Structures are given as structure tokens and as C-alpha cells.
Amino acid sequence: MIPVDNHLHSRLCGHATGEVGAYISQAVRLGIKEVGFCDHLPLYFLPPDKMIPDYAMNEDELPGYVNMIRKLADQAPLQVKLGIEADFIPGQEEKLAAMLAPHKFDFITGSVHFIDGWGFDNPAERAEYARRDIDTIYQRYFALAQQAAQTGLFDIMAHPDLIKKFNYRPHQDPRPLYEETARVFKNAGVCVEVNSAGLRYPVQEIYPGPELLQIFFAHGLPVTLGSDAHRPEDVGAGLPQALELIRSVGYREVATFSNQQIKFVSI
């Protein structure tokens, strides 16, 4: 039994397919007890003429997204929560807070997809890895993830080692980065997303991997589950493996959210 899938997208982001009702139907078929829609927040950090096509909803679509998911929650045969995935860009925290403030989300998920303007998880920008030092990339990525958690704007930190997506691994031992990230996350009071989407990409591994997840457990960080579904058929995909991983390191419960308040479900 999958207790929750807290990371579903919608067509509003421009790179997902299917109606939200189809995502719900798939969740019901799989026996998932609760889902959270977590679509991409508009790109608050870019001027209107510099927007990235098919990356996130437009700013004028955000109220409609909120209303759509709230209406869906009233009608669906399972628990549906309203979340949002917000990119962290250092120096843009006030703009981010201002965009989030008018809406009552059940949870706000923070993510890092850009390193100083480089969309490192975009296949179109993958060649940039060959032009940079991989250890420096990892250091910068985890520094940004730590800064994001410290803003206090996020309930959940998404796919915490997304930097490994294309299976480029650091030469240096990453454990010091992992330990420091766990300490910062714990002090910030965030929950970690165990995200199964990595199984669908070259890395072929859940985010976070076993070593990092073990460190998160040792630091007492709570976890939640997310498939990062951009198609109805990806709802719940890989979450049985994610649950197995979670249990293997010692977790016996996962987090759910309502009105940005955390609750726990036994697994």
C-alpha cells in the first residue's frame, strides 16, 4: 500500500500531459490513499521577456491552478492536497514569498534546478557538465539546497540529490556534503522528499540514494514520497521501491501535510 504520492504535476507547467482527473484515476487504481499536486510555480525570478518555454505555469494561471486543485479535492474519492514546487534562486526570496503569500497551500516544496543560471537537469544543457569540474558542481548544488532550506519558505525539499540525474558522480567523497546538508535541513525543520523519478532517468536511482537517505535518517529528518509524475501513468511509479528503501534505512512512517502542518502515517 502506497500511503501518499506528494508530487504530481499538471498540464499547466507546459511539459506534463493528461488531465488532472486522469492522475486521480491512476492513484485510485493503485490504491494510493493521498496525493498532492505540486506543479511548478511561475518563474518569479525571470523578467517577462526571458521566460523559459514549457517550464512552469504563467503567473496569471496560478489562481486557476489553486482553484482547480481545491475543486478536485472536494470531488475526488481520495485525499487530494494542494502543493506547489518552487525553484530556489538566491537573492530572489522576497519575490518568491510575495508570490506564495496570497495562497493557502497544504505544502510548499522547494527545489534546485538552476546553478547560477545553468539548468543542470535539462537534457538540452547536459553538455555543460563536460565544461565544468564535477566536484565544484556538487558543492554548489548542495550549497544551494542548504540555502533554500534556510529561507524558511519550504515545508519539503524535493529530490535532494537531483544533481546526479545524468549519473555524473563526484570524484571526492560526497559524505561531508551529505552530512552538512542533513544538519542544515534538520535545523531548518524541513521534510525530505524521497522521489522515485530518478528510476526513470540515466542515474537509475531514487532521490536521495541509499547513503544520503541513511544520513538523513540518522539526523532525524522526516520523509515523504513523490513520483514526480508528469503523465497519469507515472503516478505512483517507483514508489514501492522507494518505500522499500525508506524502510531499509530504518524509517517506519512518512509525512503528509495539511495547511502546512505535518502529520505522519505508519508504513
Language-model-derived ranges and their functions:
Residues 1-90, 95, 99-100, 164-167, ...:
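An N-terminally biased module of ancient metal coordination in phosphate/nucleic-acid-related enzymes
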Residues 7, 27, 108, 159, ...:
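Conserved, mostly hydrophobic/aromatic
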Residues 12, 111-219:
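Domain-core and long-helix interface of multi-subunit machines
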Residues 30, 103, 151-152, 219, ...:
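Structural motif
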Residues 33-34, 38, 106, 155, ...:
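Short acidic/polar active-site loop segments enriched in Thr and Asp
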Residues 37, 110, 159, 194, ...:
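Conserved beta-strand positions
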Residues 85-129:
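Hydrophobic alpha-helical segments and helix pairs
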Residues 209-267:
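Long, positively charged, glycine-interspersed low-complexity recognition regions
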